[in-house]
Amino acid sequence: MIWTLRAAAAATLIATSSLATPAAAQTVCEEHMIRVANAYEIPLGVLYAVGLTETGRRNSLQPYALNIEGRVFFGDSKDQALAEFNAARAAGKKLIDIGCMQINHHYHRNQFPSLDAMFEPGQNVEYSARFLKQLKDRHTSWTMAVARYHAGPNNDPAQKRYVCAVIKNMVASGFGQWTPNARSFCGEKPAA
């Protein structure tokens, strides 16, 4: 499965490293994308499509989004998101993804100086880029880095769904196009 995953989507994920601004209106999350993509040598289309897959709504990334053990929350402000986070923690919830790039608090909180820092769009996007780069270095391809960003090593079905969602977002945002292998892998029908 892993080799199939690599082969099927690799061309789409690495084919587009353009640093043009995405078509969507920029938000506070997007403002940091070009800088961190350059700093960590990540194709901008990959980073942006991961963000769209995580918190894309109304054509932009959402800085105060949470995923609380499967329940999505879009806050209007950092204070509102922090209040929702604190209520979830008080209710015993542990797996909470935070911010623009949905960094999991349980697994990654020690990489930030504070909870507040996890909600800061610049720090959230930068950590995401650093983490993606580490995954790419470990797994040798952007496709596998993207797959592991969202799901652990023993969850091939979730990895496949996530990679296909990221490819769809790359194509939709103008950062890539479907290759025959990616279409076949994701079950995407050819354009009419």
Each PLM stretch: what is its role?
Residues 1-9:
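Bacterial N-terminal signal peptides that target proteins for export
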Residues 9-15:
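Hydrophobic helical h-region of N-terminal Sec-dependent signal peptides
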Residues 15-22:
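N-terminal signal peptide c-region/cleavage motif recognized by signal peptidases
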Residues 25-192:
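Catalytic glycan-binding domains that act on GlcNAc-containing polysaccharides
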